[in-house]
Amino acid sequence: IPTTNALMCVFVQYSVTHITRRYKTLPVTAIGMLIYAFGVGSVAMMNGFQGFWLSMVILTFGELIVVPTASKYVADIAPANLRGRYMGVYWLGWGLARTLAPLIGGCLNDAIAPRAIWIGGLVIGLTSVTGLAILSRFPRFHSTPQSDLPPVSP
């Protein structure tokens, strides 16, 4: 199943990025997070290899949208002289999540049930979607590149 994720990242990422870069970053990130949340939550409802494989495909499509688009958003809102700090804090958040997730997941597994881990991921994802939808309504949170450097093109 992890091989599916890796193969999709290698062979599908460019096409997804080519499509998503045409749109505003916050709504695209929200859509990607919704797909990601659905993929995580679907694990709680699936049985057997095919079900878990389908969950991975759905989750990976969300990942292919969220990771580069959110990174672009952070780079765009950061002043050029603070871009490294902004990206550092952004990736620190990812690192903290990866550090705390096994502890929280283990507690959910022991206290409630294994499916609670995936339902918890769904709830966190939907909360993120709600937050992104709220932020996208305020123009001051819309991203515009803050650098005098020309944009990077593939």
Where is each model-derived feature located?
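Structural signature of the two symmetry-related core transmembrane helices
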Residues: 27-42
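Multi-pass alpha-helical transporter architecture, strongest
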Residues: 121-154
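Helix-loop junctions at membrane interfaces in 12-TM secondary transporters
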Residues: 44-56
